[in-house]
Amino acid sequence: MAPNIRKSHPLLKMVNNSLIDLPAPSNISAWWNFGSLLGICLLTQILTGLLLAMHYTADTTLAFSSVAHTCRNVQYGWLIRNLHANGASFFFICIYLHIGRGFYYGSYLYKETWNTGVILLLTLMATAFVGYVLPWGQMSFWGATVITNLFSAIPYIGQTLVEWAWGGFSVDNPTLTRFFALHFLLPFMIAGLTLIHLTFLHESGSNNSLGIVSNCDKIPFHPYFTLKDILGFMLMLLPLTTLALFSPNLLGDPENFTPANPLVTPPHIKPEWYFLFAYAILRSIPNKLGGVLALAASVLVLFLAPFLHKAKQRAMTFRPLSQLLFWILVANLFILTWVGSQPVEHPFIIIGQLASITYFTILLILFPITGALENKMLNY
């Protein structure tokens, strides 16, 4: 019998082992679709971004008008830009749901996979931040000024670091040029990290919704999960195109339709919606360095998840107390997101501070205690 080329060819063999003959648990639900959805998001963003970069000029005098030119005069330029801007929102929706799934089902116990995932999140956040500066509108400019300025809170080297990042004494042409270079580079870094993420995942195999070893009951990835993933692609690309075609500016800030002006500060400086939870935590501490540390901790706390797991069961499927805590955490994140979009005044200040305390308390204290308590209740 002739050897099957997909199993013998050096390159096709790798694709085969990752996407065709990969043994997958038979009971993984739609929550396991978000990994492939993130892959589609990345491909869409790289493709639309490449097309946009062909018409973009990274210069403070031309950036804003080059984006306007793309939308007005380039064939389907408006659509490409709308897909790219809203694609970022869908990227973050998918990654937050993907992390939430990992948290709920104890997937963080695959430490290497989880850690590379958190690094991917940080890289994605950096990419989105530098990308938001490129249109050079008011919110782009002031967002860049405020966030880069946070580095000045670092003792001793802070101010030098900020001026080095800016390429001068304020956010100006050198800043825009380097941010464009970084925004072009980072997605390819994300693609590389994704391959590492998948390599680690395929070492252990997927977790499942029962949180138990499923080696005795595996099915081939193709055709079962390829079809399931394609359905997922359709269900994500439909709302993305709907948003891009019908309400492209729904998630944007009206302030960004005004060209950047260093002499006029917008009344409310705020980032895109997907950073608001972290922004609320930053603002909740009335000290610059403290705020910066809390901001960093709000994401870096994910690295601690494997060490804070005290339950004998892996998933939360049969742990109602942890489930309750998990959904309180989700609600808390929604509150933080809402507070981050509001002005700094009463009652939003105190709500933000309480929500920030709750966020860290649940993750660092209540989850381990509840896990240990459930062990006791189940006589483990």
From Swiss-Prot:
The terms under GO molecular function for this entry are: metal ion binding; ubiquinol-cytochrome-c reductase activity
Could you tell me which CDD domains the record lists for this protein? Answer: cytochrome_b_C, Cytochrome_b_N
Spans traversing the lipid bilayer: 34-54, 78-99, 114-134, 179-199, 227-247, 289-309, 321-341, 348-368
Binding-site residues, heme b b562: H84, H183
Cofactor names from the entry are: heme b
Residues bound to heme b b566 are H98, H197
Quick one: which residues bind a ubiquinone? H202
Q: Where located?
A: Mitochondrion inner membrane
- Gene3D superfamilies of this UniProt entry? Cytochrome Bc1 Complex, Chain C
For this entry, list what GO says about its biological process: mitochondrial electron transport, ubiquinol to cytochrome c
Does Transmembrane count among this protein's keywords?
A: yes
The alphabetical list of record keywords is:
Electron transport, Heme, Iron, Membrane, Metal-binding, Mitochondrion, Mitochondrion inner membrane, Respiratory chain, Transmembrane, Transmembrane helix, Transport, Ubiquinone
Top-level lineage group: Eukaryota
Disulphide-bonded residues: none
Report the Pfam families cross-referenced here: Cytochrom_B_C (PF00032), Cytochrome_B (PF00033)
Q: How is the cofactor bound?
A: Binds 2 heme b groups non-covalently.
What main location does UniProt list? mitochondrion
The family note in this entry says: Belongs to the cytochrome b family.
Q: What does this protein do?
A: Component of the ubiquinol-cytochrome c reductase complex (complex III or cytochrome b-c1 complex) that is part of the mitochondrial respiratory chain. The b-c1 complex mediates electron transfer from ubiquinol to cytochrome c. Contributes to the generation of a proton gradient across the mitochondrial membrane that is then used for ATP synthesis.
Q: Which PANTHER family match?
A: CYTOCHROME B
Q: Extra info from the record?
A: Heme 1 (or BL or b562) is low-potential and absorbs at about 562 nm, and heme 2 (or BH or b566) is high-potential and absorbs at about 566 nm.
Q: From the Swiss-Prot or TrEMBL record, give the protein name.
A: Cytochrome b
Source organism per entry reads Ardenna tenuirostris
